[in-house]
Amino acid sequence: MAYPQGYLYQPSASLALYSCPAYSTSVISGPRTEELGRSSSGSAFAPYAGSTAFTSASPGYNSHLPYSADAAAAATFTSYVSSPYDHTTGMAGSIGYHPYAAPLGSYPYGDPAYRKNATRDATATLKAWLNEHRKNPYPTKGEKIMLAIITKMTLTQVSTWFANARRRLKKENKMTWTPRNRSEDEEEDENIDLEKNDDDEPNKPTDKGDSTDTEADHKLINPGEIPCDRFKDETHSKDLDPPLTDSELKEAEERTDLLAEQAKPTTSSPSVLQRGSDLITQEKPSEPGHAASTGNSNVTSVIHSPPSAPKPKLWSLAEIATSSDRCKGSSEASQAAGLSQSTVIASAASPTRSSPQCPLPNNTVLSRPIYYTSPFYPGYTNYSTFGHLHSSHGTNTSSTAHFNGLSQTVLNRAEALVRESKVRSQTQVDLCKDSPYELKKGMSNI
């Protein structure tokens, strides 16, 4: 607010009253001094610096109270702003002191009455209680609160003092009580004292008894017992497993294919996918033999794993059902690896659609299933169950008749890429040796 020069701004009486601190009503009610009026900054009721407020009883323009300077009259006017903890009206006015400590509750932090270090009187009280309760020096919550009030200490200080006292007596071999298991209250209280927890760590086994010591001795004497027991449990659980059926064998092979597919990038070119299939077919014959050797080392083999040379009936059935003239040059195992997965997931997705009805066999646009191979998303498995792209669900194996929306040129290009990748995969088997340049080249050709 800007006023013209020479204008005397006089605030109202309510503004002047509320501009003073809440605890300093003694300024109003106490006897006035000349220093207040002559101070360089004036008082809260002065319209300008160095005014003579409250120095005269005349109701002039510079006195904002309608009463005289009488203390009793001013006290009656300002009784509604006075504090119940304030001084009486007869006491001398003191501007700098405000009794903050009293109204803050029973445990006022920062109150000078509560010292940080315990006094002799406080420790004497606590020692007296400890001597009376030497058989059980664990005060309850109520007793701690009572002692805290008497000694003017906080509850934390009392708990810490008793924890330290018990530790001292324990070190001096003056324990006259039986150590007890810590209850919830004791855990709360003794966790405060960090020194006690550190010092008592070596002594804890003696409190718990000899059971932990004997267990530790047994562990030291026979260190190899634990892995042996674990090994026995594993072999026992293997004995209880029933022999697997053909469908379970199929699911086991599907899991190995899933693990191999997760290691690939989701946007790999068909050439990379074909190489991955060839790589997995080379590794796959060694897997059943490895499983058989590990099974025979423990117990008799539960999974009757077929030898690598003769293929079981399962592979040949899937191969005959979905093979075509174009894919006869490829190996049997590569077909079986891809087709067992597609037949399992297709049958899981739609039970009415059997495995011989896969319209796109292993040799078409993509030789391996990409992206998602779980039954939650069966449409991507070998492109075998894309119902919205199929014109019929018969056993026709032509690759281009079932794609209604795709152009013929794109399919021809993709087939040419597959043929290219078959030739290239014979020389390059290792997936890790593919350069990113070849990947980009394969993607750009599509």
From Swiss-Prot:
Compositional bias of kind Polar residues: 264-274, 293-303
Keywords: DNA-binding, Homeobox, Nucleus
Transferase found in the keyword field: no
CDD domains named among the record's database cross-references: homeodomain
GO CC terms, sorted: nucleus
An annotated GO BP: regulation of chondrocyte differentiation
Localization, UniProt: Nucleus
Location (main, coarse): nucleus
Keyword Iron-sulfur: no
Entry-linked InterPro entries: HD, Homeobox_CS, Homeodomain-like_sf, Iroquois_homeo, KN_HD
Family annotation (SUPFAM superfamilies): Homeodomain-like
Gene3D superfamilies recorded: Homeodomain-like (1.10.10.60)
A Pfam entry, by short name: Homeobox_KN
Basic and acidic residues bias (residue ranges): 202-220, 227-258
GO molecular-function terms, A-Z: DNA-binding transcription factor activity, RNA polymerase II-specific; RNA polymerase II cis-regulatory region sequence-specific DNA binding
Region of interest called Disordered, as start-end residue ranges on this chain: 175-312
Composition-biased stretches (Acidic residues): 184-201
Disulfide links within the chain: none
Residues annotated to bind DNA: 117-173
Function: Transcription factor. Binds to consensus iroquois binding site (IBS) motifs 5'-ACANNTGT-3' or 5'-ACANNNTGT-3' in regulatory elements of target genes. Required, together with irx7, for hyoid joint formation; they act cell autonomously to repress expression of cartilage matrix genes, such as collagen col2a1a, within immature chondrocytes of the joint interzone. May compete with or modify Sox9a activity, thereby reducing Sox9a-mediated activation of col2a1a. Probably acts in the developing hyoid joint downstream of Bmp signaling. In concert with irx6a, plays a role in visual performance.
Similarity remark: Belongs to the TALE/IRO homeobox family.
PANTHER family: IROQUOIS-CLASS HOMEODOMAIN PROTEIN IRX, IROQUOIS-CLASS HOMEODOMAIN PROTEIN IRX-5
Protein name: Iroquois homeobox protein 5a
Species the sequence originates in: Danio rerio
